[in-house]
Amino acid sequence: MSIHEECGVFGVYSQRQEDVASLAYYGLYSLQHRGQEGCGIVVNDDGVFDGHKGLGLVSEVFTGSVMKQFPRGKMAVAHARYGTTGGSNLANCQPIQVNHLKGKLALAHNGNLSNALQLRRELELSGAIFHTTSDTETIAYVITRERITAPSIQAAVSRTVDRLEGAFSLVMMSSTKLIAVRDPHGFRPLCYGKMKDGTYIVASESCALHAVGAEFQRDILPGEILTFDCDGIHSDTSHCGTAPKKMCIFEYIYFARPDSVIDGVSVHDARVRAGEILAKTHPADADIVIGVPDSGLDAAMGYARESGIPYGIGLIKNKYIGRTFIAPGQDHRVDQVKIKLSPVESEVRGKRVVMVDDSIVRGTTSGRIVQLLRDAGAKEIHMRISAPPFLHPCYYGTDIDSREHLIACRHTVAEIGEIIGVDSLGYLPLENLRDLCGSEEYCSACFDGDYPTSIPEDTRKDQFEQKLSQRKAGEKP
């Protein structure tokens, strides 16, 4: 009950005219957990782009009347947004559409650029006019500028990859091609699948492939540029291996859906392993193990399995409200917690409870959940967290924007436990983090401060928009 992720991207390429908008709709539905601020779909009907985007959930933005207005087409690009740069307004919703000298471009982006301000300044000095505060528009403009001299859109994208720093998983389309790109570190997931009729699907997670009936083909490699067109699939691996692979390990702990498989690792299995490790490193004398829905459930199963303590359903989630961390602003977050979870009193009353959750960022949500269980009659509450303490901001597409918001930066574990009101508190040990996925090829900078890339001084999630506002006001950033 903690941190939030960035966005979900989805793309469709078909050799024939079909209802690609509906495929994009169902794909976004499966990626809704990655972003709930807004969403958008752009359909390519023989080079004519038709798009719609709005603030809200997929079901709210794409009503039946809206979906009927989409033409049939051969391609579509779609996006579910949570803003890691730029404010929560319609202009910052994606996909971004750009008309340029040599054609059109529709772009959806998952991640966060660490050099967005520098690139934007260079573009503005050369005459670019921006309409959003999103770094996705910056990427789109870099591509279109490179396309002026590049022999093809693929070449323009390749040149753009050389200029981008940070995390970016992209799905874009020109008039004739669908292109998927994953940054050289592979911070964010991206994969593709194939339907029985030959239609190709690109998505942030494999769960979205299954939702539309596509068979998973493979993950897109870190640094790979994959192009789909009338001649088939073309893979450009010239950027592969130029940087160490650093997939965000928090995808497995919290962001991704448990039924997804990312880079060959089951998200569900990784979470269960986290719970098993917690049971060994932080045992507790208890009567029941419960998980905080949703991402704490799998880890709770692992804890119960390893400890031998019965697993139970102690908290029920209101499925019609989004993740607490996804709502922008602390006031919204507190309001949502009050209606999001309800305790199952018969399961917890008079019992010593082990409550497993994925993380504690600010402590706001955790304290409220603990109080819910106390009010329901829990005798003891032993909280176990399936990740190490958050000690450092993330600059690669999540909403851990500054150290001042991280409770673990200001308090010891014992103090945090006292603040949130538990009888004991235990985190997944940092040295056991790699055991979740059986590899060292992961980014864990939010836990250990070991950033894979250079980070601009004082960079924050909201710095991009703050500096843009200062420029407009004539201030020196």
Q: Where do the model's predicted regions map?
A:
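PRPP-dependent phosphoribosyltransferase catalytic core
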Residues: 161, 176, 213-215, 219, ...
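A structural signal for isolated positions on well-ordered beta-strands in alpha/beta enzyme cores
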Residues: 40, 354, 382-384
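Conserved short alpha-helical segments that host acidic/polar catalytic motifs at enzyme active sites
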Residues: 1-222, 227-286, 292, 380, ...
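Secondary-structure transition/capping motifs at alpha-helix termini
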Residues: 128, 149-150, 283-287, 305-312, ...
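Short, glycine/charge-rich flexible loops or terminal/linker lids adjacent to PRPP-binding catalytic cores
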Residues: 308-353, 363-364, 391-397, 401
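Extended, hydrophobic alpha-helical segments in both membrane/secreted and soluble proteins
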Residues: 289, 296-303, 307, 311, ...
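A conserved beta-strand->alpha-helix junction
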Residues: 132, 137-140, 311-322, 419-437
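Flexible loop/turn segments at secondary-structure boundaries
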Residues: 84-85, 115, 187-188, 209-210, ...
